[in-house]
Amino acid sequence: MTETIKLMKAHKSVRRFKEQVLPQEDLTEILTAAQMASSWKNFQSYSVIVVRSQEKKDALYELVPQEAIRQSAVFLLFVGDLNRAEKGAQLHTDTFQPQGVEGLLISSVDAALAGQNALLAAESLGYGGVIIGLVRYKSEEVAELFNLPDYTYPVFGMALGLPNEEHEVKPRLPLTQVVFEEEYQEQTVDAIEAYDRVQADYAGARATTSWSQRLAEQFGQAEPS
């Protein structure tokens, strides 16, 4: 097994950080690695906002009350960005069509790929982090806080810093439930209940709801919880 694969398999979210600065040299390495992620047609339809200011992190916390935001050495906001595409298109045409869902997917996937590269790079340097998708639930307020222009939107945030907590890698679904040969295999309730038990064994006394209950809370209503 290569060192890269070992690092990937050891991934765990970190939400508590030591009070220590993340040096610019390391941050540049992390962001450069992020930029080398795959991108649809090399459009690179995302931007990253680096947040070091405690005042700005506190303001974001008021919108998205996740303690990792305030504790982080650096908070990265990954932005789906078609504003750059608009500027480029203006060189050749008077019209710009962001393409609805397709444009949303292009920029979201580009941002996600860059984000995964960034987190992996950070972990390789000894840092930890956590993805914060709740910024989408306050997208208008977050956009205003960070002065986002037209054709941009917050996809997710990433809190980074030196870990100040230790816990085990969270068990994933069995590979046979997410990887299928040649065609899709329908999910079974028995398999989901089995994974509920695996998650319960992992969480122990910390568990308040099962994995499938959290699915119901998220997808059992029209609006996200």
Name each model-derived stretch:
Residues 1-225:
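Acidic, surface-exposed loops and disordered segments
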